Amino acid sequence: MNCAIIGSTKIAEVHAEQLVKNGVREITFISRSEKRRKKIISKVKKKINKKVFFFHSDIKILKKNFFNIICICSNTEIHHKHLRIVSGLKSIIIIEKPIISLLKLKNRYESYLKNLYKKNKRIVVCYPYLFLAKSFKKFCRNLKKIDRIIFEFQTGGTAKFEKICINLMPHALSFFHIFFKKNFLKKNINKTNPIVKKHIWQTSFKVSEKVINLVFKENYKKKTSVKLKLNDLVLVRKTKKNRSKFINYIQNYQTNKTQNINNPMEEFYKDLFKNMNNKEYYKINKKLTLNIMKKNNFFLN
């Protein structure tokens, strides 16, 4: 099985590692910069001890060669351009969230996505926080009693102002889609005006008698972490490095105990490869994506 990865950033490295773990043995990195393509191949080779063939090229390779999987890890602002190029191909398309930039397409995003899904029925948007939510949920015995929630998400990203919301809201919405009942995204929401700063985007909203505060932060100098406060219970997801392996864990601030959890990205890829030939899997991801984009647009406007 072979794969083309569009992009040469850190997230492209992460996807490459997971693809190799699931049996991909030939990867072509696609980028305008030959220097960046060679650099990312060098980095990935150091992390992988399996026999994998690496190649690199520009975007034109997609018209010449067939790839079983095409993974889009480019800047969100140009997702729509890359999707236009690959949508008519017979490859499975994996794309980093959000599927497209709402600031770029604005009110045209719905018609764009409608036409996109007509051309390719095997598009999967990467939502690892579906699986992170399952890990957090194990700490909460009675969700009905929870009426105050704070979801604080900090990353080492570089997005600023409204772009922080576009970048991180899909994580939060997919998280609550699993954490609460699956009709969460369809419920009516009463929101407050957001507070938008250079490195912070935050808002609060009420849904089903629960008040939820969202606090998104992006700062390239900070490590990624997720803090979930449920009434008086405070849970934080962190990572630590043990030799060459990253360990994911949740810390309970009430008991000061920690519990290791599965890597959400690993869980996403296991689920993807398990359902690669399952038509219903792609339909569910499509429905989730359309609901997330609709709610994200609601919070922006």
Language-model region placement:
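Conserved acidic residues
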Residues: 27, 68, 147
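A contiguous active-site-proximal alpha/beta segment in oxidoreductase catalytic domains
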Residues: 100-157
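N-terminal Rossmann-like dinucleotide-binding module
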Residues: 1-48
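Beta-loop-alpha module in the N-terminal Rossmann-like domain of NAD(P)-dependent dehydrogenases
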Residues: 3-5, 52-114
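NAD(P)-dinucleotide binding in Rossmann-like oxidoreductases
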Residues: 194-198, 207-271, 280-284
